[in-house]
């Protein structure tokens, strides 16, 4: 918004020329996100606490989580406010990359909000806290993925084919369908990525500061990719495809990183608030959407490695348990689980690792994977 209001005045006020630089607007978005978090955070937390919007502690979680039942949840509202306010202020709102990323984040945030709200309502009514019915939640995520995939296929936002993606470590390698009809497979591909990443971040959100820190690392990395791919000179030097307009996603990424760090101020152990599904689904949607828009879905194997491992641990745990339950009986299946507890972070807690140790070590792994992802720009 400020770009369109002040940039035309740059001839008279030279200071406004700074708005032409994505780096300046990204830095401004980051700082604004922090300020919004610090200003609105305490008020939102007080309101959530007054409304008794408390975290639901699931059965079977480590004993150290027993005291978290009084911690307010739905703190993802802080993240959403701290993301959208700076994006609306500092980004070029005519840019389709930014608009699509915002739309996906908002859509997933609404799904998460409904889930958190229904859990609260069911708790007050003395019912089982299941939240939004799983199939309805999945349907909402799938619908979002179908919409994004169809839009990108029918209205490409770059010079690259709509149904295409790139591969890390390869120069100018574009993966496209071999036949025309196969282009429609791009829609379920986008749906799979978006749904998978949003649920992966949701599964990871089980320890104080874990998912917010990992998302900040992942989105910061994707933001650097957006800046590189959005510049003619840098993309040519690194021999990657140029995506006109993609650089504006750097501003969006900076806002998300600032929102995550601002939220981490309140979510660090011992947490004053949890993001709930409102935050985790929204952040997962943002990560997935950015990777899809940058034609860099396979990059998620690096920047989202921890999220991927958490998801695999849950799938493996459930699959093996069901198999052993059917073949050997419940007693054997319960005694011979693959992990002591899934997702993976709970497994390490059950092994005796303190919560903060698990979080910091997972952050370290996330940083190392981010460095590996950045190395793909040069190792081609």
Swiss-Prot record:
One of its GO terms (molecular function) is metal ion binding. Its EC number is 2.7.8.13. Its cofactor is Mg(2+). Pathway: Cell wall biogenesis; peptidoglycan biosynthesis. It catalyses: UDP-N-acetyl-alpha-D-muramoyl-L-alanyl-gamma-D-glutamyl-meso-2,6-diaminopimeloyl-D-alanyl-D-alanine + di-trans,octa-cis-undecaprenyl phosphate = di-trans,octa-cis-undecaprenyl diphospho-N-acetyl-alpha-D-muramoyl-L-alanyl-D-glutamyl-meso-2,6-diaminopimeloyl-D-alanyl-D-alanine + UMP. Catalyzes the initial step of the lipid cycle reactions in the biosynthesis of the cell wall peptidoglycan: transfers peptidoglycan precursor phospho-MurNAc-pentapeptide from UDP-MurNAc-pentapeptide onto the lipid carrier undecaprenyl phosphate, yielding undecaprenyl-pyrophosphoryl-MurNAc-pentapeptide, known as lipid I. Belongs to the glycosyltransferase 4 family. MraY subfamily. This is Phospho-N-acetylmuramoyl-pentapeptide-transferase. It comes from Gemmatimonas aurantiaca (strain DSM 14586 / JCM 11422 / NBRC 100505 / T-27).
